[in-house]
């Protein structure tokens, strides 16, 4: 009779227990089994792609001071005073900061590659134009980013087997993406009901991208929802009203804009639940950007921010220090002495201090669903179970063929 130790089930139990022990010993290294980061999205994750794609005679605002002042001490193409959420995730995983793919010469993409472009939309610009929504910053939509990734695989990883191994062992950041689809519409004062009509199209596009990457071998995805945009200085300026009923009496946000974000996030989570059922062997983590940021506006002093968290650090004019025609990075636009005291950096994007707290809420707190550490553990288990991986690959192929 075979010993209990020879049984696959017991070996798996022993492995899980040993992994849990190692994880509990050092929480800072709990996710180091990921080999790289692959990122798609917009300005929330752009580490320099829009800058790399731009004409030297027509550079984006992120190419000019004070962007980058806090951590890098010079502009890097990031729309913040310092690091972004993707940067803090990379540091947590023990990786170098993820380099931008576009326009980046001699970059080392072994530990990560970033296709996120500031101004990018989930939907094609032509789709938005047909609905009277003008997107003029970039045409590098989510599908274009995904196509760039697919076409670059021979240079990133070489052989098909090496590429599949890279994708399987990567943490794939799917966004934030989709926010600009709504921003461009709302900045044009489109009725919110009309903006809501975009939601199923945006979600279907994100879902399709995840499915395509799953079929390429993707096993772990971090998919963010939208921020509570009712706290954005840009929207508070654009939609300023004397009707006090539209504002939250405690925080001063525009309630209807936050309601829209909640509506979108709920629909996105329902779609992710469907994908989890279709691909039970894949870790699809919802990143709750909404609540991770919301707490900073609700209790600013608790997190080290000044008691007026709504105005932008960098900007000019009005109650919220924001003006669409004189934005951060423009000549003569002032900026605060200490960005770490602000949540809002330029009226649209957050400060490094805010992004740090959001990242900690995802990596160590309750704002990743399921919790981030368990997703890492699942990835480690799958890496150790070669036989089961072959079975899952067969199931995956069947699932992809049904799509």
Swiss-Prot record:
<keyword id="KW-0442">Lipid degradation</keyword>
<keyword id="KW-0378">Hydrolase</keyword>
<keyword id="KW-0964">Secreted</keyword>
<keyword id="KW-0732">Signal</keyword>
<dbReference type="InterPro" id="IPR035669">
    <property type="entry name" value="SGNH_plant_lipase-like"/>
</dbReference>
<dbReference type="GO" id="GO:0016788">
    <property type="term" value="F:hydrolase activity, acting on ester bonds"/>
</dbReference>
<comment type="similarity">
    <text>Belongs to the 'GDSL' lipolytic enzyme family.</text>
</comment>
<feature type="signal peptide">
    <location>
        <begin position="1"/>
        <end position="27"/>
    </location>
</feature>
<protein>
    <recommendedName>
        <fullName>GDSL esterase/lipase At1g28590</fullName>
        <ecNumber>3.1.1.-</ecNumber>
    </recommendedName>
</protein>
<dbReference type="Pfam" id="PF00657">
    <property type="entry name" value="Lipase_GDSL"/>
</dbReference>
<feature type="glycosylation site" description="N-linked (GlcNAc...) asparagine">
    <location>
        <position position="139"/>
    </location>
</feature>
<keyword id="KW-0443">Lipid metabolism</keyword>
<keyword id="KW-0325">Glycoprotein</keyword>
<dbReference type="GO" id="GO:0016042">
    <property type="term" value="P:lipid catabolic process"/>
</dbReference>
<dbReference type="InterPro" id="IPR036514">
    <property type="entry name" value="SGNH_hydro_sf"/>
</dbReference>
<dbReference type="GO" id="GO:0005576">
    <property type="term" value="C:extracellular region"/>
</dbReference>
<dbReference type="InterPro" id="IPR001087">
    <property type="entry name" value="GDSL"/>
</dbReference>
<feature type="glycosylation site" description="N-linked (GlcNAc...) asparagine">
    <location>
        <position position="323"/>
    </location>
</feature>
<feature type="active site">
    <location>
        <position position="349"/>
    </location>
</feature>
<feature type="active site">
    <location>
        <position position="346"/>
    </location>
</feature>
<feature type="active site" description="Nucleophile">
    <location>
        <position position="43"/>
    </location>
</feature>
């Amino acid at each position: 009779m075979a010993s209990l130790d020879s049984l696959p089930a017991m070996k798996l139990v022993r492995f899980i227990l040993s992994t849990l022990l190692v994880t509990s010993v050092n929480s800072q290294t709990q996710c180091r089994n990921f080999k790289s980061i692959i990122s798609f999205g917009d300005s929330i994750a752009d580490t320099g792609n829009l800058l790399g794609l731009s004409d030297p005679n027509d550079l984006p605002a992120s190419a000019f001071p004070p962007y980058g002042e806090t951590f890098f001490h010079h502009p890097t193409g990031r729309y913040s005073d310092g690091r972004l959420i993707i940067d803090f995730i990379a540091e947590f995983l023990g990786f170098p900061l993820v380099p931008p793919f576009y326009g980046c010469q001699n970059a080392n993409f072994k530990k990560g590659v970033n296709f996120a472009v500031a101004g990018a939309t989930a939907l094609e610009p032509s789709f938005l134009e047909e609905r009277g929504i003008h997107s003029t910053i970039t045409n590098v939509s989510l599908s274009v980013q995904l196509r760039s990734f697919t076409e670059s695989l021979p240079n990133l990883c070489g052989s098909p087997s090496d590429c599949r191994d890279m994708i399987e062992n990567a943490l794939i950041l799917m966004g934030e993406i989709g926010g600009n689809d709504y921003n461009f519409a709302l900045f044009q004062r489109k009725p919110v009901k009309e903006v809501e009509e975009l939601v199923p199209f945006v979600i279907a596009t994100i879902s399709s991208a995840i499915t395509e990457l799953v079929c390429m071998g993707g096993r772990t995805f971090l998919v963010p929802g939208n921020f509570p945009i009712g706290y954005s200085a840009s929207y508070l300026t654009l939609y300023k009203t004397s009707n006090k009923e539209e504002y939250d009496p405690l925080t001063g946000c525009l309630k209807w804009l936050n309601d829209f974000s909640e509506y979108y996030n709920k629909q996105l989570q329902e779609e992710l639940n469907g994908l989890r059922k279709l691909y039970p062997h894949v870790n699809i983590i919802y990143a709750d950007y909404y609540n991770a940021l919301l707490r900073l506006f609700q209790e600013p002093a608790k997190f080290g921010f000044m008691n007026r968290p709504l105005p932008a650090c960098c900007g000019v004019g009005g109650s919220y220090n924001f003006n669409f025609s004189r934005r951060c990075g423009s000549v003569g636009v002032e900026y605060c002495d200490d960005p770490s005291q602000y949540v809002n950096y330029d009226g649209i994007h957050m400060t490094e201090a805010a992004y740090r707290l959001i990242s900690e809420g995802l990596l160590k707190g309750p704002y990743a669903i399921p919790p981030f550490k368990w997703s890492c553990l699942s990835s480690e288990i799958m890496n150790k179970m070669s036989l089961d991986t072959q079975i899952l690959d067969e199931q995956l192929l069947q699932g992809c063929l049904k799509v």
